[in-house]
Regions:
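Signal-transduction coiled-coil helices of two-component systems
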Residues: 32, 49-52
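Conserved E/DxxT/N motif and adjacent residues on the DHp alpha2 helix
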Residues: 44, 51, 161
Length: 303
């Protein structure tokens, strides 16, 4: 009963052939699991409610009066996120929105831009309900700089002039200087004609490009969501000065996580659980020694 080398070779060959179907089955099951996961996302997208029809309403001249009348909204109909929300913002006001994570700050911005429709109440710009305006007309009223930056595949010029395709080179350069992005742009291999990819510049440089877009378009109203979060301290001070200049005479909404950046706001809204629990200027809220007072002091103690 001795096993020869030839017999061992045949045995191993048969064993390999025997295991091959099991390996194939395992691979098929893995592929099926991946396909089911992909299908789940596709079906979830197909089951989403269709976006409501876009009306043809426009605004010729925007003064910047924003009114929010008894607005309610929730992502999950079983759990209210924003309810009984009322606000009257006069033209040129600088409104800061603060509060703990999940209180509804970003949701408020999404409703203002009509990324979502309100469940109840209405939002008006210069007296016109935003659901009567075309989305293009509404969103053209605002310039946005968000914490999460977005750069498209293309040149620096394309990324800056995204909202104003007919901008001249002089206008682009002036906007870049205002946003303090020109220093790094002119050091790129081809300057404004350098082709960008997602990883070709730093997060801070991406944020400066997003700020430059707004400086170029000069919209009638601004939305800033921690717009300088990825920028070094020295550049942040310079950009903040540029923003202060840009916000003069423009209605501005500033979502703030660092409370030191909103001391000069015309109105500070303190949100919690989807409701405004305090509002006023910085000094007034500190004197009340309420939620804002504790939030403000906790940041400085932590730092």
């Amino acid at each position: 009963g001795a096993l020869t080398v030839g017999g061992l070779s045949v045995l191993l060959s048969y064993a390999n052939q025997y295991m091959k179907p099991f390996n194939d089955i395992s691979s098929v099951i893995t592929e099926m699991q991946n396909a089911l996961a992909c299908a789940g996302r596709i079906f979830a997208l197909l089951e989403e409610k269709e976006e409501s029809a876009d009306p043809a309403g426009t605004i010729d001249t925007v003064t910047g009066n924003v009114t929010i009348d008894d607005v309610a909204f929730s992502y999950d109909k079983e759990k209210k996120l924003i309810e009984n929300f009322n606000l009257d913002v006069q033209p040129g006001m600088r409104v800061a929105i603060v509060g703990p994570t999940g209180c509804g700050k970003t949701t408020f911005i999404n409703l203002l831009m009509r990324f979502y429709d309100v469940d109840a109440g209405k939002v008006c710009i210069d007296g016109k309900p935003i659901d009567k305006l075309s989305r293009h007309a509404l969103r053209s009223c605002f310039g946005m700089v968000l914490q999460d930056t977005w750069i498209k595949q293309g040149t620096v010029r394309d990324n800056i002039s995204f909202g104003k395709p007919d901008a001249t080179e002089e206008e682009i350069i002036n906007a870049a200087k205002e946003a303090h992005s020109w220093e790094f742009i002119k050091r790129l291999p081809k300057g404004l004609d350098t082709v960008l990819s997602e990883d070709s510049i730093s997060q801070g440089q991406k944020q400066l490009l997003c700020i430059t877009r707004v400086m170029l378009c000069l919209p009638p109203m601004l939305i800033l969501d921690e717009a300088t979060s990825s920028i070094d301290t020295r550049t942040e001070l310079q950009v903040q000065e540029a923003f202060d200049k840009l916000m003069q005479g423009r209605t501005s909404f500033v979502v703030a996580h660092r409370l030191s950046t909103i001391r000069n706001a015309s109105l500070i809204l303190v949100m919690k659980d989807g409701k405004i629990i305090e509002q006023g200027r910085h000094e007034e809220l500190l004197e009340k020694k309420g939620f804002y007072y504790n939030l403000y002091n906790s940041q400085f103690q932590a730092s």
